[in-house]
């Protein structure tokens, strides 16, 4: 086979530190300065706007059993399994609040579970969360669905 060819100029051009990819959209696209009325207004405009595009959901499960020293994610390191029960109840309340503005049964074409480590949840808790999502949203067949896992726990 032919020897590999590397363009030295191309290597010099891209041999610089770049942004660390962690998620899409990236964290700088999220706003923390929105008030509850502003969020409600945004959701209302989304629900009643001319385009009824499918939704994309991000479900954040912040818990991890141990810290990964390379990780820059928003996380809570704990061995206390009881924290997830209360957190799931809050996720269900948040879904209900969002759907109060959007309406139930909205089509979801993309969903990602991130963390933390979503597989911190026990099997029954994962089932509970999926059931909560399925009763509130309509998951598009053939949609894009993903979950971050700790391979040591699967």
Give, region by region, the residue ranges found by the protein language model.
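Flexible, acidic/Gly-rich N-terminal and inter-domain linker regions that tether
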Residues: 1-55
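Short helix-terminating capping/connector loops at secondary-structure junctions
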Residues: 50-53, 103-107, 138-142
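Canonical Radical SAM [4Fe-4S] cluster-binding loop centered on the CxxxCxxC motif
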Residues: 54-88
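Hydrophobic faces of well-ordered beta-strands that scaffold small-molecule active sites
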Residues: 55-59, 109-111, 143-149
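Conserved, mostly hydrophobic/aromatic
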Residues: 64, 91, 113, 147
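Glycine-rich anion/phosphate-binding loops
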Residues: 82-92, 151-154
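A short, N-terminal amphipathic alpha-helix
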Residues: 91-101
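Conserved glycine-rich "GG(E/T)P / GGGxP" loop and the immediately following alpha-helix
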Residues: 99-136, 149-154
